[in-house]
A protein has these predicted regions:
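Structural signal for interior beta-strand "rungs" in well-ordered beta-sheet cores
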Residues: 150-197
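Terminal amphipathic alpha-helical/low-complexity segments used for targeting or macromolecular assembly
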Residues: 1-148
Length: 197
């Protein structure tokens, strides 16, 4: 037993610093809850509450990046600021275009709220859009943790390095794989069981 414990201790000492998947998963889910109240566990009805939650998330990302400098080649605070400065244009606006494509592209969709709350494709593309922005900022591992979290929940595996255009629609979702070298244009609709790249 002593030898086994020594092996485990060595493994723990050699493990590169990285935030726990639970920390990253919580960050992503909380961020998605701010962007889309349909995913929020709390109603942020007044601007003050929204600003506070937004600031908390920004600080959380700063802390994650500052404590894990091996995952990037920059300043954790600067990278977190860049992420939140680009969040509206690179994530929020594109997700609303994706939402529009999914709602209009699926005759069974009764409302955009249904797509946001129920469609695994929307959850997967949300994770991709967040992870892709982090990836473009030169942050490693964390983007992959986010897309793998979505993969475990949706059956959709999208590498954060893939290039996906605007108005992207994933219908049914299960069994979709989009690899790192994949380039998907604008206004593309993909059904279940498709591998690209």
């Amino acid at each position: 037993m002593e030898v086994f414990l020594n092996r485990l201790q060595k493994a723990h000492n050699l493990c590169p610093g990285c935030p726990s998947p639970k920390v990253i998963n919580r960050f992503f889910d909380d961020l998605l809850g701010i962007l889309f109240p349909e995913h929020s566990s709390e109603a942020l009805k007044d601007k003050g509450s929204l600003e506070l939650k937004f600031s908390e998330l920004k600080l959380q990302l700063q802390k994650i990046l500052t404590m894990n400098v091996a995952l990037h080649n920059g300043n954790g605070e600067d990278l977190a600021n860049q992420f939140f400065e680009k969040l509206e244009e690179e994530v929020y606006n594109k997700l609303h275009e994706d939402l529009d494509a999914m709602y209009k592209g699926d005759p069974a969709a009764k409302s955009k709220t249904e797509v946001i709350r129920c469609y695994p494709g929307f959850y997967a593309i949300s994770a991709y859009r967040v992870a892709h922005l982090l990836h473009r900022l030169g942050i490693s591992l964390i983007p992959r943790m986010i897309t793998e979290y979505a993969h475990s929940k949706t059956g959709v595996d999208i590498h954060p390095g893939a290039m996906i255009g605007r108005f992207f629609c994933i219908d049914h979702a299960t069994g979709i794989v989009i690899g790192e070298t994949t380039l998907v244009g604008d206004r593309v609709k993909i059904y279940q069981g498709v591998t690209l790249g």
